[in-house]
Amino acid sequence: MMQKKIDWSRDFIQKHQQLFACPYCHAAIETIDGYSLVCTNRHRFDINKKGTLHLMKQKANEDYDAELFTHRYELAQSGFFNPLLDEVLSLIPKQENQLIVDIGCGEGSPLAYLSSFLETIPLVGMDIAKEGILAASNHHAQKALWIVADLAQLPFKDESCGTLINMLTPSNYKEFNRVLAPGGKLIKIIPGSNYLIELRQQLYKSNEERQHYSNEDIVERFKQEYP
């Protein structure tokens, strides 16, 4: 019989409790009280029945609805991202107890795909969109711990993460550098200039400027941070 989602998440956090930090005060998670995480300053975070966890100060982003994540899930299940994810997999160090975090995981399909090859490594998928994390829990229960969190305030201790995956989403290099362990790896996937060009050409037929995309600023910023 499959373990309940809420129990699986509690057990995962208990096993890796030393990796997490309070998003309010950055203190250590001191205890697991039933289905709640409690930091040393008594801030409390409850695991819900879906097994997900809200680990950020503000309310979750509600700009993205469930329909968007349903379509993204369907695209992922078609195998569209698999060649890219195979390349990502080849870059991940296979070290047990080295936490891997997918920052901006959406509905979780990329990390769920990777989990099939990383069965002994702790995985966390995080996104600021509540609907994305709920979809991840619905489709990919027990593949990873799914949390609502903000990349500007990562709920992890300093030097606690072995690998960060940042796929087609914004970055916060200050936070990335804080949580990466010595020798840790950041894998950032940046769209190419022709990314979604067919859609842009259809959506912006009367605006040629918006039909084009440049990743030069993103690439340059990455090079500045990691010369």
Spans of features found by a protein language model:
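A short SAM/SAH-binding and catalytic strip from SAM-dependent methyltransferases
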Residues: 161-175, 190
